[in-house]
Amino acid sequence: IRSDGGAYCFSTKGTVAKSAICGAGPYQIENVKVTATGYYTNNTPSGAMRTFGVLQPTFAIESLMDICSEKLGIDPIELRMINGMKDGAVTHTRQVLGKVAYTETLKKCSEIAGWEVGSSRVRGSVRKDIKGSQIAEPYIPGKEFKSEEAMKLCRDRFKYGRGVGTGWYGIGRC
């Protein structure tokens, strides 16, 4: 991960550190190395905004998961279920996790969202009023996320919408 810290690198150190910590996403990857470097440049000062360095690696790892699922001919949800961290998982920073609700959360979200098994090309009729069908999983180490409570809360407040966003704070947030 390379970060353009601008002329002063105000918050580059913290942003780059967080990018490295979140670089592998919520996936159990046996052989992974994440390198993150911040650079001084002649660009305007830049640094932490909203997710403090988490957005860039999250976008990269989730895009990679989509590319892999397409090349392997596997449903994107299925690939994430196979590789998602489970109870007792060890992160690439060697942190041992206790209870991990990733697969349960992903399964429940895909059920509520009406995600059907199979690639989008064979999934059946596609709604014309909504462009695309995506799912993303927020990965915030150290933050307690109770999937059961979140899904109970979201079920009645599920939203459909259109938009382009760079994080899960966007249009479908409960």
Language model feature labels by segment:
Residues 85-174:
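Helix-loop-helix junctions that connect adjacent transmembrane helices in secondary transporters/permeases
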Residues 1-57, 138-147, 152-174:
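Gly/Pro-rich active-site capping loops and adjacent beta-alpha segments
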Residues 40-45, 81-90:
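Short acidic (Asp/Glu) and glycine-rich catalytic loops that position anionic groups and cofactors
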Residues 10-22, 50-78, 83, 104, ...:
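Alpha-helical support elements that line or immediately flank enzyme active sites
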